[in-house]
């Protein structure tokens, strides 16, 4: 899974009833906003398509996109999604862009509405099957265990030209490598021991 992923907000959906069907309906009704700043990125459209194709409940996947674009590019044309209620798009000419923090703040201020969860990504990702339910289940289980979790990871690599070949299918985490001479810390990716046997996230010190 491309887990440069952060769930940063949680609202409780009240549902006090029994039965498998009720649980499934409750799960499918929980919405998740994919928080995507995109700067002239040819991988934006493939990222959107892969997210929807691999979601267990694609109707509950919403998109908040800050599109910093050049109209001459064409590869990030979102016209096919402009009438889709799941998509909220803020467009600006790439010459007006002010950097990643500005784009993320713009999404927070104008595109984040009443979704139950937020999944903060870059605009170049691939997804595993049922990624939406996996993340929500992990989050909710941690809440039930008494935590107030943020779920994240260090994104493993993929090659957009050959994908799905050459994908790195091992999840990574953020590790401290050293301090720079001027005092800031250098973060690098590292493997997660025994990840094949894990059923839930592990505690971490750093968030990518």
Residues covered by each model-derived region:
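Catalytic cores of eukaryotic secretory-pathway lumenal/extracellular enzymes that build
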Residues: 29-208
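Acidic, Ala/Val/Gly-enriched low-complexity intrinsically disordered segments
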Residues: 6, 14-16, 24
């Amino acid at each position: 899974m491309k887990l440069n992923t952060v769930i940063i907000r949680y609202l409780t959906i009240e549902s006090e009833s029994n039965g498998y069907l009720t649980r499934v309906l409750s799960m499918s009704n929980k919405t998740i906003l994919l928080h995507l700043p995109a700067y002239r990125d040819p991988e934006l459209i493939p990222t959107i398509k892969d997210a929807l194709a691999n979601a267990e409940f694609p109707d509950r996947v919403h998109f908040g996109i800050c599109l910093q674009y050049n109209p001459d590019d064409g590869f990030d044309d979102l016209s096919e999604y402009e009438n889709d209620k799941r998509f909220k798009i803020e467009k600006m000419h790439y010459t007006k862009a002010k950097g990643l923090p500005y784009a993320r703040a713009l999404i927070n201020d104008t595109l984040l509405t009443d979704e139950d969860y937020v999944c903060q990504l870059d605009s170049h990702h691939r997804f595993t099957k049922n990624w939406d339910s996996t993340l929500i289940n992990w989050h909710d289980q941690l809440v039930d265990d008494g935590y107030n979790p943020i779920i994240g990871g260090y994104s493993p690599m993929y090659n957009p030209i050959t994908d799905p070949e050459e994908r790195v299918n091992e999840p990574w985490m953020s590790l401290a490598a050293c301090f720079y001479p001027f005092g800031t810390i250098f973060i690098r990716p590292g493997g997660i021991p025994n990840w094949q046997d894990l059923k839930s996230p592990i505690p971490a010190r750093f968030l990518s």
